[in-house]
From Swiss-Prot:
GO terms for molecular function: argininosuccinate lyase activity. PANTHER family: ARGININOSUCCINATE LYASE (PTHR43814:SF1). This is Argininosuccinate lyase. Keywords: Amino-acid biosynthesis, Arginine biosynthesis, Cytoplasm, Lyase. GO terms for biological process: arginine biosynthetic process via ornithine; L-arginine biosynthetic process. It comes from Solibacter usitatus (strain Ellin6076). Pfam families: ASL_C2, Lyase_1. Gene3D superfamilies: Fumarase/aspartase (C-terminal domain), Fumarase/aspartase (Central domain), Fumarase/aspartase (N-terminal domain). The gene is argH.
Length: 460
């Protein structure tokens, strides 16, 4: 069946029907479509389009359709144009002629906006719950090694020593922002579009506020033309998905490196790795590589809808049907990646000796030395030059920080008094970084406790 056709002398061609149909993918909206139509039936009763008996008959039929739609058999042989048409056809089969009234004063333009908004707000909540789990795993792993020291990197070169929990808390902060981003996306989606009609507003005095309350929306949209041409709420959701995937990809990249033989910091669990069909020794970080790979796919989902929307005239255009596949795909890939990340974190263990040795044998203490000189009264630019020459001399002599004695340091530069030798130990320099947000031991312990407390307050 079609929800249109009187103006046409013949039906659509077979090629066009195949090309334009969306049931294969928008069927995921069926539960939202049914709930929205049930609320709309109540609104139609309130304006006298449906009697109480007719409304009850329609709502009961929708309940039956909703239950049956859980089975794949429900869709077998369906050739409907989209999920809305399928639902109306099924309604007619159960409720008869009264089903013809359900679309009174309603357009598929607002209906698909409603369905998508409902789906996105629920999916946003689900993804927040998965982010919550990842953040909890990060804190668990941080608490296992509260005093472990690792080199921090800039430009993929050893830069300064940091505590392992400080590093993990950096990702906690990223994922916390992601958690809030999905909350923002849900809030922006959570306004009712019903009553907007195709673009000019419904011709019936529907109680939009009552429908909003019935469906759990926080309010109603304010402009019917905006509703018809709007997919900002979908872009907001896709942006949240994309940024989260980028954060997951960065974590994956780090851990692919840190678990390699060259680093040897991390041991990934057998359950999240795979082997080689040829090389018996291999233990490959496939889970992390797939997360990294899927991030590009999700970036593409956002890009595709941005490009689709960029040149559309007001208001609705059929191009906007192309929002569903990127939305669904981004949500699926992110959900799978979050579950995988949580499993990876849970299975991973740190070998503290390896990153500690990497920190001790490199010049991650250089900034500590320069800042200590500055605290002792040497202008920082001069201190920077002194330490730079000291590092250069060490490189030429193939000396590690621990190879220097206090006497040799003082002989190299009189500004290096005997107490400076202690700063050649990375742990010593971190004592000066007891600042909120810094990597000092007490600061990190406080940050870890705060993160745990904050996680407990998040509403999922």
């Amino acid at each position: 069946m079609k929800l249109w056709g009187g103006r046409f002398e013949s039906g659509p061609g077979e090629v066009f029907e195949r090309f334009s149909g969306s049931l294969d993918f928008d069927r995921r909206l069926i539960d939202c479509d049914i709930r929205g139509s049930q609320a709309f039936a109540r609104a139609l009763e309130n304006v006298g389009i449906l009697t109480a008996t007719e409304r009850a008959q329609i709502v009961e039929a929708f309940d039956s359709i909703r239950a049956e739609s859980l089975s794949p058999a429900f869709y077998e042989g369906a050739t409907d144009e989209d999920v809305h048409t399928l639902v109306i056809r099924k309604l007619k089969e159960r409720a008869g002629a009264v089903a013809d009234k359900i679309h009174t004063g309603r357009s598929r333009n607002e209906q698909v906006s409603l369905d998508t908004r409902m789906w996105l707000r629920e999916e946003s909540t689900d993804l927040q719950a998965q982010l919550f789990a990842v953040m909890g795993r990060l804190l668990d792993l941080a608490e296992m090694y509260p005093h472990a020291i690792i080199p921090g990197y800039t430009h993929m070169r050893r830069a300064q020593a940091v505590l392992w929990p400080h590093y993990l808390l950096a990702y906690f902060e990223m994922f916390l922002r992601d958690w809030h981003r999905f909350g923002d996306a849900r809030r922006r989606a959570n306004v009712l579009p019903l009553g907007s009609g195709a673009l000019a507003g419904s011709g019936f005095p529907l109680d939009r506020e009552a429908m909003a309350q019935n469906l759990g929306f926080e309010g109603i949209t304010q402009n019917s033309m905006d509703v018809s041409g709007d997919r900002d709420f979908a872009l907001d959701f896709l942006y949240a998905c994309t940024v989260t995937m980028i954060h997951l990809s960065r974590l994956a990249e780090d851990w692919i490196l840190y678990s390699s033989e060259e680093f040897g910091w991390l041991e990934l669990g057998d359950g999240v790795t795979s082997g080689s069909s040829l090389m018996p020794q291999k233990k490959n970080p496939d889970s992390l590589e797939l997360i990294r790979g899927k991030s590009g796919r999700v970036v593409g989902c956002l890009t595709s809808l941005l490009v689709t929307m960029k040149g559309l005239p007001m208001t609705y255009n059929r191009d906007m049907q192309e929002d569903k596949i990127p939305i669904f795909d981004a949500a699926d890939q992110l959900s799978g990646s979050l579950l995988m990340t949580s499993a990876v974190i849970e299975s991973t263990r740190l070998n503290p000796a390896r990153p500690a040795a990497a920190a001790e044998e490199s010049w991650v203490v250089a900034t500590d030395l320069a800042e200590a000189l500055a605290r002792a009264g040497t202008p920082f630019h001069q201190a920077h030059q002194i330490v730079g020459r000291f590092v250069l001399e060490s490189v030429r002599a193939n000396k590690k920080p621990s190879d220097w004695t206090a006497e040799e340091m003082h002989a190299f530069a009189p500004e290096f008094t005997p107490d400076f030798a202690a700063l050649l130990n990375p742990a010593e320099g971190m004592k000066s970084r007891e600042i909120p947000g810094g990597t000092g031991t007490a600061a990190v312990a406080a940050a870890l406790a705060h993160a745990r407390q904050l996680l407990g307050k998040l509403i999922v």
